[in-house]
Amino acid sequence: MNIPNHPETETLQLTKVLHALSDPLRLELVKQLAEAKEKTCSTCADVQVAKSTLSHHFKVLRESGIAQVRIEGKRRYYSLRAEDLEKAFPGLLEAVLNVDQDRW
């Protein structure tokens, strides 16, 4: 099984994080992750995209260091790395989560 790579907190790059946050769908996923402990592609039913597209967006969030994945059987459970983001970029996540959706 392929174990996903999660960047260490000390290696998070602001440009990668901001790039990941530059997409409205990924912003919605980050908001959902902030409200829930974990999410899977199937629990994001309100997001109207193909499962493969959703998986791609979760991959971008994971590779940027915003999200982490836990694999259990065939399921991938995604969660927000809020503490790591706060440590690396204080206030960034809070600022992003407080922006009204009409300003995305």
Swiss-Prot record:
Any Pfam family hit: HTH_5
InterPro entries cross-referenced by the UniProt entry: ArsR-like_HTH, HTH_ArsR_DNA-bd_dom, HTH_MetalResp_TranReg, WH-like_DNA-bd_sf, WH_DNA-bd_sf
Sample GO molecular function, one term: DNA binding
PROSITE patterns hit by this protein: HTH_ARSR_2
SUPFAM superfamilies per the UniProt record, alphabetical: Winged helix' DNA-binding domain
A biological process term (GO) from this entry: regulation of DNA-templated transcription
DNA-binding region: 40-63
Ranges for domain HTH arsR-type: 6-100
Alphabetic keyword roster: DNA-binding, Repressor, Transcription, Transcription regulation
Name the UniProt record assigns to this protein: Uncharacterized HTH-type transcriptional regulator YczG
Organism annotation: Bacillus subtilis (strain 168)
Upper lineage: Bacteria, Bacillati, Bacillota, Bacilli, Bacillales
Encoding gene (name): yczG
